Amino acid sequence: MAKKLRKRERKFRFKRPQWHIYLLLLPMVLLSVLPILYIVSTAFKPTGELFAYPPKFFTLRPTLDNFRKLFEASEDTVFPLSMYLFNSIVSTVAVVLIGMIISLVAAYALSKKRFRGRKLIFKMNTLSMMFVATAVSIPRYLIIKEVGLIDSFWANIIPMLAMPVGVFLLKQFVDQLPDEVIEAARIDGANDYQIVWKIVTPLVKPALATVAILLFQNAWNGMEASKMFINTESLKTFAFYMNTLSNSGNGVAGVGISAAASLLMFLPNVVLFILMQSKVMNTMAHSGMK
């Protein structure tokens, strides 16, 4: 027992050279954490501290008044908050499930199937990762209009399904699967769908978890569809609703309401990442992305 304790102590004891690494990483960690702490602190600040001088980073008298004002503002709207929340939950679940399937099938085809133009398609997929959503908003609107999805609930789902980074991550994992395993499954009579479902999927779960998180963040926080593609209020999402409420506040009170709305939108992302943190780290270690 004593030997085990000594081994455990040696395992977690910092060596002197490691302190240099932690000193370099500490500023980066602080820069990443400070915005989160600021949102949390501002959401719980009373009105008198929001623009106090000198400003205080942390509140000394935390309160739930900003959240109360946020929900009071939601009661004055025509449609209830629950309707927007339902729209977001349905569209987010659909985007995550369908997007994972599309990304996995595309990654398998680009990795293990041999067809003309395969390398060109993957290069185009990689190139598309360079463009932000704003750069393609007009072409996306024109496509949505041509296929007749304007002012449709599907406009919340279909534009979110294309995820080049998801295909890229999954392809790196599928590339590592031995071709002999795939060939053995084909000899046993398995078709491509059975290979993807029964062989590939269990072996790329870390990458799938990472893709699920990215899809969730895009769908849950996305407001593009509600702003550009949808005119009917009953089809809009929770993110758009929270953004509208936070912008409706005036002056000091509006800052507190905005921080409370931002915190409510941010919490599901944090919870999901914490639950899948180990799989995300595994994905980054094996995908070539650092």
Q: Can you say where each PLM-predicted feature lies in the sequence?
A:
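A hydrophobic, multi-pass inner-membrane permease signature
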Residues: 2-290
